[in-house]
Amino acid sequence: MNTYSEDFSDQAKCKQIALNQIDQGASVVFQVAGGCGLGALDAAKEKGVWGIGVDADQSFLGPHILTSATKGVDTAVFDTIKSIQDGTFKGGKDDVFGLAQHGVGLGKISPKVPKSEVDAVMKVRDDIIAGKVGQIPTIVK
């Protein structure tokens, strides 16, 4: 299920969207909605289902957080500034900062997740970094 809040600040709106999805059978809430998404994570806590944080590690929100999809904006900014300083910056092109470049990643994984499952996730992550996984989709359909 996916629903667009069309809002990045109204936590009550995102909470209601998440509650509706949970009522329809969702057992994990993965929000990508800025501050609005905090309401969705609150709904996950309230209903006793997993929540997945976004942008930074949101495990501090409680034991209902499975993990977080993190963005390494700091890495992208640092690398870009460094390339400007050392004269290697080439404007006019897109640079992709994936797992290998620390542009994306996972926050802390809940200690409630069995080690075998964490190991399986880490293996896939390592395989992606090593180029052993084919084309990764970049568009939600």
Per-segment meaning from a language model:
Residues 1-141:
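A residue-level marker of the well-folded mature domains of exported/periplasmic proteins
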